[in-house]
Curated annotation (Swiss-Prot):
Pfam families per the UniProt record, alphabetical: ABC2_membrane
Ranges where the ABC transmembrane type-2 domain occurs: 37-258
Highest rank taxon of the organism: Bacteria
Species, as recorded: Neisseria meningitidis serogroup B (strain ATCC BAA-335 / MC58)
Function: May form an ATP-driven capsule polysaccharide export apparatus, in association with the CtrB and CtrD proteins.
Name of the gene: ctrC
Keywords annotated in UniProt: Capsule biogenesis/degradation, Cell inner membrane, Cell membrane, Membrane, Polysaccharide transport, Sugar transport, Transmembrane, Transmembrane helix, Transport
GO terms under biological process: lipopolysaccharide transport; polysaccharide transport
Intracellular or extracellular location(s): Cell inner membrane
Name under which the protein is recorded: Capsule polysaccharide export inner-membrane protein CtrC
């Protein structure tokens, strides 16, 4: 009898890359293949939010107190919020939507979750780049002060979105009502994400609590890269790294635990 071929680490990695790639294509076709407005919404949602913030800024006549470009302020906060919010929300339904694919030997529960989150992160990234490029081209906002620092902030928050999504998906699998509640909780968390304020403008006691929230550090870091020395920010990249590691470790452990009880349908 022939001995079973044991795949090496690199072979296993290549297989997983192909599996996730195939799942990504399936998600793209399923979500955007028949209805292109779904793809367009990636750009429409942050633009609408920017428009609302600009209108509020003008209505409150806040330009009398600050010379900050409000369009740049909005567009450097909301798309990042949209990335982690949507990635974690989409992770919740990833298993039920792909349960039939688990019959395939190489498709794992983790792959189905990662594919959905990667698609959301990629979509938010494309939206951020395109919108900023257009706004710079038409002269509504200036070029970023430090694009590399912005990129580092975005990558850190992308890993945060993955870790958060793994944890939320695991909780929702074990406690189904939480999956429905999480959508509402993300709206409650929006004002706390740092997308609509600078930590520097908060009272000192409130600043301490705000800086306990990892999303605030990500937004502050992203805006520090865009505005440069024009604004005062309080980000700590190492705090985001620590939070990411904790979320990823807990998330992977939780997914590994409940995956054993998932049966193909």
């Amino acid at each position: 009898m022939k001995a079973l071929h044991k795949t090496s680490f690199w072979e296993s990695l290549a297989i997983q890359r192909r599996v996730i790639g195939a799942l990504l294509m399936r998600e793209i076709i399923t979500r955007y293949g028949r209805n292109n407005i779904g793809f367009l919404w990636l750009f429409v949602e942050p633009l609408l939010m920017t428009f609302v913030i600009v209108l509020m800024w003008k209505f409150l006549r806040a330009d009398r107190y600050s010379t900050l470009n409000i369009v740049a302020f909005a567009i450097t906060g909301y798309p990042m919020l949209m990335m982690w919010r949507n990635a974690s929300k989409r992770a919740v339904g990833s298993i039920s939507s792909n349960a039939s694919l688990l019959y395939h030997r190489n498709v794992r529960v983790l792959d189905t979750i990662l594919a959905r989150m990667i698609l959301e992160i990629a979509g938010a990234t494309i939206a951020q780049i395109v919108i900023m490029a257009v706004l710079i081209a038409i002269g509504w906002i200036e070029m970023p002060a430090d694009m590399f620092y912005m990129l580092m902030a975005w990558l850190l928050m992308a890993f945060f979105a993955i870790g958060l999504g793994l944890v939320i998906c695991s909780i929702a699998f074990n406690f189904e009502p939480f999956g429905k509640i999480w959508g509402t909780l993300t709206f409650v968390m929006m004002p706390l994400s740092g997308a609509f304020f600078f930590v520097h403008n908060l009272p000192p006691k409130v600043q301490e609590y705000a800086l306990m929230i990892p999303m605030v550090h990500g937004t502050e870091m992203f805006r520090a890269g865009y505005f440069g020395s024009d604004v005062i920010t309080y980000e700590n990249p190492w705090y985001i790294v620590l939070c990411n590691l904790v979320l990823l470790l807990f998330g992977l452990a939780m997914v590994s635990k409940f995956s054993k009880g998932v049966e193909p349908q």
